[in-house]
Swiss-Prot record:
Protein name as it appears in the record: 3-hydroxyacyl-[acyl-carrier-protein] dehydratase FabZ
GO molecular function: (3R)-hydroxyacyl-[acyl-carrier-protein] dehydratase activity
Database matches in SUPFAM superfamilies: Thioesterase/thiol ester dehydrase-isomerase
Entry's Gene Ontology BP terms: fatty acid biosynthetic process; lipid A biosynthetic process
Keyword Zinc-finger attached: no
InterPro entries: FabA_FabZ (IPR013114), FabZ (IPR010084), HotDog_dom_sf (IPR029069)
Length: 158
């Protein structure tokens, strides 16, 4: 058993919600199990039959929409960018905006009962712009992958 599978979460859902603006049902990361700031992050999404998208996708044969797998990976990328900020930077004042997704590939369906492992790694960083590679895995098999570009920006004051 890998350390990522055996250890307690690095971030639980409450810690994740302090960083990401998403909320259920659109929060697609349940926990972070490994993080190396500036390098990589591994997160999980437990896919249950109670997911609202299964009502219409597809009745009688529920399959997680591929675009939501990509969204889960993008949320993991945002977590990695924020967790990679320096100690002098204020996490509460930052938000990550997705700029592009390239090379998306889907290998097999994700269904109720699957645990989606979200593996993201930094490819390149230039200032506030991040290029990351994301791979979604279920039971050791790649189910989706894509390249992401995002910008870490200041949140507007409300």
């Amino acid at each position: 058993m890998s350390a990522e599978r055996a250890s307690a979460p690095v971030m639980d859902v409450e810690a994740i919600q302090r960083i990401l603006p998403h909320r259920p049902p659109f929060l697609l990361v349940d926990r972070v199990v490994a993080v190396e700031p500036g390098v990589r992050l591994v997160a999980w999404k437990s896919v249950t039959m109670n997911e609202p998208f299964f009502v219409g996708h597809f009745p009688g044969k529920p399959v997680m929409p591929g675009v939501l797998i990509l969204e889960a990976l993008a949320q993991a990328c945002a977590l990695l960018a924020v967790k990679s900020m320096g100690p002098d930077e204020d996490v509460d004042e930052k938000i990550t905006y997705l700029m592009s997704i390239d090379g998306a590939k889907f290998r097999r369906p994700v269904v109720p009962g699957d645990r989606l492992e979200l593996h993201v790694e930094v490819v390149k960083r230039k200032g506030a712009i991040w290029r990351q590679k994301g791979t979604a895995i279920v039971d050791g098999q790649t189910v989706a992958e894509a390249d992401f570009m995002a910008m870490l920006a200041d949140r507007e004051q409300e």
